[in-house]
C-alpha cells in the first residue's frame, strides 16, 4: 500500500468516489467522501460517504441493508478522486437497481 496525501481541499473538503463491483468492474455509483468518511471506510472496510443533500455522514447499508465491503482503493493521478471496488450486498442504488447507471442516453447499436 502506498501512502498518498489525498487532496480534500480542492473540492471544498470532498472527494468524488467512483464505486465499482470488484468482480465485474461494473460502475455502481458515484458519491462523495470527506476526511471522516474516508477514515471510517479505511478503519472498518465498509463504505462511508458524506451526504451532500443531508449534510451528514452516511454508512452505506445502515438503512437499506445494502452494505458495501471494500476490496480495493485507488486514487487518480491528482489524488482528488477515489476509485473503490466493493463487494455489493443487494442494490447500490436507492431506486433498488443494482447500479445507479441504468439510464442510457446514447448507444449507437
Swiss-Prot record:
GO biological process: L-histidine biosynthetic process
Keyword Coiled coil: no
InterPro entries, alphabetized: PRA-CH, PRib_AMP_CycHydrolase_dom, PRib_AMP_CycHydrolase_sf
The organism of origin for this protein: Streptococcus mutans serotype c (strain ATCC 700610 / UA159)
Assembly behavior: Homodimer.
Gene designation per UniProt: hisI
PANTHER family named among the record's database cross-references: HISTIDINE BIOSYNTHESIS BIFUNCTIONAL PROTEIN (PTHR42945), HISTIDINE BIOSYNTHESIS BIFUNCTIONAL PROTEIN HIS7 (PTHR42945:SF1)
Binding site for Zn(2+): 77, 93, 100
Protein known as: Phosphoribosyl-AMP cyclohydrolase
Record bears the keyword Methyltransferase: no
UniProtKB keywords: Amino-acid biosynthesis, Cytoplasm, Histidine biosynthesis, Hydrolase, Magnesium, Metal-binding, Zinc
Superkingdom, taxonomy of origin: Bacteria
Names of required cofactors: Mg(2+); Zn(2+)
Amino acid at each position: 500500500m502506498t501512502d498518498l496525501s489525498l487532496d480534500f481541499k480542492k473540492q471544498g473538503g470532498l472527494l468524488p468516489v467512483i464505486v465499482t463491483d470488484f468482480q465485474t468492474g461494473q460502475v455502481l455509483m458515484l458519491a462523495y467522501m470527506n476526511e471522516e468518511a474516508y477514515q471510517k471506510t479505511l478503519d472498518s472496510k465498509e463504505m462511508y460517504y458524506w451526504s451532500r443533500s443531508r449534510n451528514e455522514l452516511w454508512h452505506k447499508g445502515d438503512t437499506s441493508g445494502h452494505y458495501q465491503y471494500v476490496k480495493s482503493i485507488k486514487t487518480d493521478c491528482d489524488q482528488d478522486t477515489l476509485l473503490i471496488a466493493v463487494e455489493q450486498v443487494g442494490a447500490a442504488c436507492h431506486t433498488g437497481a443494482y447500479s445507479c447507471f441504468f439510464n442510457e442516453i446514447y448507444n449507437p447499436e
